[in-house]
Amino acid sequence: MRSCTVSTMPRMICRNADLEFDWLQPCFYPDEDDFYFSGPNSTPPGEDIWKKFELLPTPPLSPSCAFLELSTEPSDWASEMMLTEADLWGNPDEEDVFGPGGLGSLTPNPVILRDCMWSGFSAREKLERAMSEKMQHGHEPAATGPATQVPGAGAASTAGRGHSGTAGAALPAELAHPAAECVDPAVVFLLPVSKRNPVPVRVAPARAPARAPAVGAAVARAAAPASAAVAAPPGLSSRPPNGGDHKVLSTSGEDALSDEVDEEEDEEEEIDVVTVEKSCKTGGTTFTLTVSPKNTALGLRREQSRELILQRSVPIYQQHNYAAPSPYVENEDAPPQKKIKREVSPHPLKSVIHPKGKSFSPRKSDSEDSVRRRNHNILERQRRNDLRSSFTTLRDHVPELVKNEKAAKVVILKKACEYVHYLQAKEHQLLMEKEKLQARQQQLLKIIELAWTF
């Protein structure tokens, strides 16, 4: 909770020097603490950047590098990251804010020149990076003392809304002194370290100690909404300065999002095959599968295991051994069936006594099969005899094959067909002659009748 009520109106600024730039926070961050860490579907800070600026006017153009040559006195992080109220809201009465007097406090490599939208990706990320670098660089003087406030803070902010010359002179006087008392970043930034590579940023060296506790309090309030939603990691270390170049690990919500995704994947239903029982039987194999779902949302179904019994027939492949005896006849002394057929007498009334042998079927069924087979053979023989006699009779009626006793059946059929066609033609011819003769007979009968009348 903020100690000072801050208004979002352009002209309303808190008179406290520690909270002078607190009114800039609603421009970039919502009041909700869990905006970026509300859930796995929340968008990163860089994707909804245009939604943050839809209520703000068009930002002023970045100043040219020509004004940097006139800078004689370097400024600290506040002049690089923040603008005055008149610059932010575009006061038409102060169009010369970016004059030599207003930009005299910028460093040779300000952050605002590298990002014309002030914080194109994330304003808080750059603010935290700049503050951590300032604090790490401030460990070299290592001067500790009580917190002091500059009495001209309110006057400087009030003068910034007046004339441009006064604003350009008062703002560097207030913010030109870097931090004298440094704060450990592990205490201020209670956020998990991101997996992204750090970005090197050059920061101007500190010259005069001042306002360390005030700066630390402002940064702590800026990082408070995010640290309330995410727990602090057990170990958070910062890298020492190396040749004036400082690398700071930026914080983000990637770790929190990945943890939530892993928890959702663990909650999904998993089906494990608990037991697989394979029992080999004669001509078949039985597989027993026990399926147990793992999900707390299923309730009573989780305790009840489902057993699926899949039973399928496995064919038995055996290689035929031609030298082995027949599996259907156990008695080796029993003669094959061909010998039985040969022993059948051509006479239909003669009975044949089959040799006694062991078989899988009963004796009654064997006798019935033999009787049926014998009757079938007799009927087949009679049919063949009748067919042979029919061909012989047909051959005798064909004049060309009367004397040919060895004529084939095909020849007999062919010659018989030709002879039938010949007989049909002859019959038709005889019928025509008969009709002519009948007509001639009628004429002769009429002549006889006329002769008898005269």
Curated annotation (Swiss-Prot):
<dbReference type="InterPro" id="IPR012682">
    <property type="entry name" value="Tscrpt_reg_Myc_N"/>
</dbReference>
<dbReference type="InterPro" id="IPR002418">
    <property type="entry name" value="Tscrpt_reg_Myc"/>
</dbReference>
<dbReference type="InterPro" id="IPR036638">
    <property type="entry name" value="HLH_DNA-bd_sf"/>
</dbReference>
<dbReference type="Pfam" id="PF00010">
    <property type="entry name" value="HLH"/>
</dbReference>
<dbReference type="GO" id="GO:0005634">
    <property type="term" value="C:nucleus"/>
</dbReference>
<dbReference type="InterPro" id="IPR011598">
    <property type="entry name" value="bHLH_dom"/>
</dbReference>
<feature type="compositionally biased region" description="Basic and acidic residues">
    <location>
        <begin position="363"/>
        <end position="374"/>
    </location>
</feature>
<dbReference type="GO" id="GO:0046983">
    <property type="term" value="F:protein dimerization activity"/>
</dbReference>
<keyword id="KW-0539">Nucleus</keyword>
<keyword id="KW-0656">Proto-oncogene</keyword>
<dbReference type="Pfam" id="PF01056">
    <property type="entry name" value="Myc_N"/>
</dbReference>
<feature type="region of interest" description="Leucine-zipper">
    <location>
        <begin position="423"/>
        <end position="444"/>
    </location>
</feature>
<feature type="domain" description="bHLH">
    <location>
        <begin position="371"/>
        <end position="423"/>
    </location>
</feature>
<feature type="compositionally biased region" description="Acidic residues">
    <location>
        <begin position="256"/>
        <end position="270"/>
    </location>
</feature>
<feature type="region of interest" description="Disordered">
    <location>
        <begin position="133"/>
        <end position="166"/>
    </location>
</feature>
<dbReference type="GO" id="GO:0003700">
    <property type="term" value="F:DNA-binding transcription factor activity"/>
</dbReference>
<keyword id="KW-0238">DNA-binding</keyword>
<feature type="region of interest" description="Disordered">
    <location>
        <begin position="231"/>
        <end position="270"/>
    </location>
</feature>
<feature type="region of interest" description="Disordered">
    <location>
        <begin position="326"/>
        <end position="374"/>
    </location>
</feature>
<protein>
    <recommendedName>
        <fullName>N-myc 2 proto-oncogene protein</fullName>
    </recommendedName>
</protein>
<dbReference type="GO" id="GO:0003677">
    <property type="term" value="F:DNA binding"/>
</dbReference>
<comment type="subunit">
    <text>Efficient DNA binding requires dimerization with another bHLH protein.</text>
</comment>
<dbReference type="InterPro" id="IPR050433">
    <property type="entry name" value="Myc_transcription_factors"/>
</dbReference>
